[in-house]
Amino acid sequence: MTTVQKKPALPERSHLSLPPPQKPTRHSWQVLAVLMMAGCLSSAAGAVVAPVFPEIVEHFGLSSRWAGVLVSTHTLTTALSSLVFGLLASRLGSVRILLSCLVGYAVFGGVGAVANGFWGILFSRALVGVASGGIGAGSIGILSNLYNGEARTRMMGYATSALATATVIFPILGGWLGLYHWRSAFLLYGLGLPVALVGLLLLPKGRRRGADIPQADGIGAILKQSRVVLLLLALATASAIFYVVVVYAPLYLKQAIDASSLLNGFVLAARSVGAAVIAAVGAAKVSKRLGAGGAIATGFLLMAISLATIPSVLEPSLMLLAGLIFGLGFGLVMPNFYSALADISPDSQRSGVLAIGTGCASLGQFISPFIFGPIWASAGTQVFYTAAAIAATVGVLNWLRR
């Protein structure tokens, strides 16, 4: 893994709807608030379902080996659509993409509440992923062009904190609704409609532009840089490890102590509390003191410690503490990754590069069950030790290369 030295941005104006102001304005804060609300829904695409996942597995009689694919299906379509929407942002306008995908998120997500079979829910999850990819590509592209340098890292931290806060609330809400019936959790996707309405009122309307072939060519050149490739691989790795907690921790707690959907929701929420706290108040400071590589290394090592303790922790209070530690690590890793990608991307290619980063993170979540599912099926709790070993290895490599 690698750290990336900052390069001065090229003097090209971004192709997104918003020019980057030198100082935050009232309007930019309003835009930031809308982007955070939209991003919260996108980040909660999996968190809504995770607490009721054991009930879904039981209802459909799914094999434990591949059951995680149901939770992670949306991440594959998110990965694919993030790249497409990122490249289309200059042609269709980021705001237009964002608003339409928010509506799609609400509609497609709600289908899960009425789907009659496993394949219907799976198809619904795939479409939710498409919408989530558009939300993420539009949101992070606009955000990256609102601020520069250290301010961007700080704002990325605020955004990560908001997204993590959403994944505090949504698992608890999903788990609470799941006490009545697991289908009720899918109703939370309907929140995409009011957020789309707020966005329609507050976000500037982008202009339709012609196709931007040079942007695609420029992105291809950037992707040939070894540092960028390593960052994207690390993003995918972090997300794959993240989904070990999302998918297999609830299944383990269900088996070990017959945990309810509400308890699973609180445990998942504790992870998000840690991410919210460190992303809001610590990610930029740790990065400034240790460098991006040092901050990323510290985050991975915290994730490893948390994962290694899961099999031996059965007290609710200790479960929450383990989740909190994992969240602290994840909250250090992600904003520094995205900020590093933004720093080495010219203005005209930044939205596309960050969309690819989002896609790689989603791809990591999708492949997680294929990598760790067989370990869970054959060795049970060894899946947590395996993920911890991978996280520790990535952390050490980043520390050595910082």
Describe the residue ranges of each PLM region.
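Paired small-residue
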Residues: 104, 108-111, 119-127, 317-325
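Juxtamembrane intracellular "pre-TM" segments in multi-pass secondary transporters
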Residues: 16-24, 204-231
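A late C-terminal transmembrane helix in Major Facilitator Superfamily
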Residues: 344-381, 387
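Helix-to-loop junctions at the C-terminal end of transmembrane segments
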Residues: 82-93, 278-291, 376
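Helix-loop-helix hairpin linking two adjacent transmembrane segments in secondary transporters
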Residues: 149-150, 157-202
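Cytoplasmic helix-loop-helix junction between adjacent transmembrane helices
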Residues: 118, 124-163
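Conserved MFS/SLC helix-loop-helix module at the cytosolic interface between two early adjacent transmembrane helices
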Residues: 80-119
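Helix-breaking motifs and short loop linkers at transmembrane-helix boundaries and internal kinks
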Residues: 61, 93, 114-120, 148, ...
